[in-house]
Structure formats: structure tokens, C-alpha cells
Amino acid sequence: MRKHVLLAGFIGLLATSLEAGAFEEYKQQQAAGVKKEGKNFVQHKAAEEAAFKKYQEDINRAYSDYKKEVSLYWEEPRMSTKKEWVSYAKDKKTRTAVDFEAETITIETLAKSAKDAVSMLQVSLAKVVTETVAQAEKADALIQNIAKIDAESNAVEPKKPNNDPLLSSTVFAKVPTMEMVKKYVGDKVNKKSVVSSRSKINDVKVYSVTVKLPRNSMQKRSKVYMSEVQKNAKRWDLPMPLIFAIMHTESNFNPMAKSHIPAYGLMQLVPWSGGQDSYNFVYKKKRKPSASYLYDAQNNIELGSAYLHLQYYKYMKKIKNPTSRLYCTIAAYNTGAGNVAYAWLGNYNIYKATDKINMMTPDEVYDHLIAHLKYDEARHYLKKVNKKMDQYHKLYGDI
């Protein structure tokens, strides 16, 4: 029998108390809940789906336009992903890439001489290790373009700027002084550490430096969110290791995470589906959160945890065994409750699928999901989260 990494402590906690699809997945999720009928409902859903499609097209257009703009300067126009945050200077001639999975900072600049390059690279490194999330958002032209699209669609905006540090709590043991930053930058960026390569622009080269983040950076970043995770684990009757495992798997604790869907932030919420569902559940208002709202860690953890609560206590509530229900909840967070049902029935009705699920042991449910989930990503996702739950249980305990 498989050794359960879902330990008894947080199974007991659960017993007592997406986001991978885009437009098609959004429609499936709408069909996964309680059945609703009537012409007005159908018309309303059609209007919602049309609005989501337009939003996605507008976001994709903004992304494509920005990519074309930076490609004028760079052979490879790198863009932000779930695990890597990429930002460009206003003139697009310097860029910074923080890889939260590889735990590196890579800065590149276009310059005529190594001397000029070293100076620019030092300034850029000092900036990225000291700036806040709000400052990073303000300096990112693509994020600002997306903010305009959100404003046009009446998305919920954050009430105040997010002044959480982006990297300083990972890089420095305490709030850094100017002297600490200057020493750090001087140690990391110098003529010996900077390398050059060919540029697509005449008379300049690409100068770059790669800086490794400190050891245990992942653990340090997770600790930054400890109080919010504890608060929401208690509020939504969830095991704390589950929330940490989802955050780690979704973004590697990158608060600026963005996927192509698009999904945003630490727990990778899609504004028009999981984001809207959870916001409506928490605040009783059917509105979608903006990208900026979801880049705020407090907001993201609240809504992401609420979305897990919805999956476990609403969509999966008829699954009797808490471990089986948890496996299905993890899969549903990534691929939607409808696709979990599809693994058993070939249709998207999760309530009907529970009859078959309840006939299986937790091990059998896990094996069935791994074998029959519609998408490979969801299968790998379940494995990763399951493994990381054990990791965070050992690190922090249940609550």
C-alpha cells in the first residue's frame, strides 16, 4: 500500500470542519456546480463567457504587443512566467529576470563598454533586491497595460499599494541599510563576474551577470507568508501544509507570478473563474479581482484558500473519505472539478462522479486520478502537491 504523505493530523483537521484551463475550462467549471435553468440564466452565462473571451483576447494582445516592442532590442524577448519574473527598464535596454525556481537573479544590459555595463548592472541589482511589489508593478509597462484593461472591465482593485518586499527579506537577514546594499552589489557585480555576448544592435554588446540567491531561499520566502497562511488555514478549515504546497507548486513563492491563461500571484488565480468564484464567496459580490489585486499576497492567499475551501467543502462534499476528497480537491484546483469528474464518467458532473469515487479506497482514487485525469499537467500537479504537503508538514507542522 502506498505510504500516505497526507498525514493524520491534517486529515483530521479537514474532517472536522485552476487553474490550468482557459476558456473551455472556465465553461466546464460553470457546469460543475448546482444545476440552474431558464432563459435568463443561459443568456447571462453567454454574456459572461463573451466578456471572459474578450478579456483574454485583450490580455493576449497586450502581451503580444509588448513582446514585439522588447524584441526590437533583444534576440530573445523573455517574458514573465509562473516561476520567473522578468522586468525591463523604461528604455528596454536593461532587463532583470528573477528565477524563483532556479533561485537566481540574471541582469542583462546593452552597453558600449564593460565599464558602463558594470555601473548599470549594479544599479539594477540594487533596485531589484530592495524594491517592493508596488514599486515593481509601477515600473512594469506590461503590468500597467493590463491594469488599464482591468479598469475597463470594472475589476476589483487593491485598497492600498502593496509595500511587501519583493526580495529583500530573502537576500538580507534584516532590513538593509544603504551600506549593506552597496556591499552586496559590489561583491556580486564587477568586471570579473560580468560576461559579454553579441547583441542584435550594432555597436553594443549584451553584458550580463547571474547572482545566486542565498541558501534556503525557498524556505525563507515561505516564512514571509506564514502569518497569512496560518490565518487562512484556520479561517477556511484547511491544513496549513496544503496551502503552502499549492503556493510552492504554483509559483515557487513568486508574488509576481503570471501564466499565459492568465493567472496571477502566489496561488495562480484566474480572475474570471477561480478569482471571481472565491471573491464572490468571501465578499458576496460577483466581481473579478484585477491582476494588481492578485499580486497582493494577502489578497491572493485569502482568495486562493477560499477557493480550496469551495472545492473541498462544496464541490467535493459528497466524497466520504477525507483523504480521497483531498486528492480530488488538489486535482480540481489545477484542472477544475469538471475534469476530475471526467476522469470517472467522461462528463463534467462532479456530483454524479462521487458515487464511483466512494466505492474506492484513497489509494485507488489517487491511482485512478494519476491514470485518468484528462491532462498530463494535472497528473504531475497532484504528485507534486502531495509530496510537498509532506515537506511542509515536517517543516511547520499542521497549524
Residue ranges and their predicted role:
Residues M1-L7:
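Bacterial N-terminal signal peptides that target proteins for export
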Residues A8-A15:
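Bacterial N-terminal signal peptides
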Residues H260-R287, N299-L310, N358-M360, V385:
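Substrate-binding/active-site groove segments that recognize
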Residues M256-S259, Y279, Y342-G346:
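Short, solvent-exposed loop/turn and secondary-structure capping segments
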Residues E19-A245, Y313, I319, G346-I399:
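Cell-wall glycan-active module
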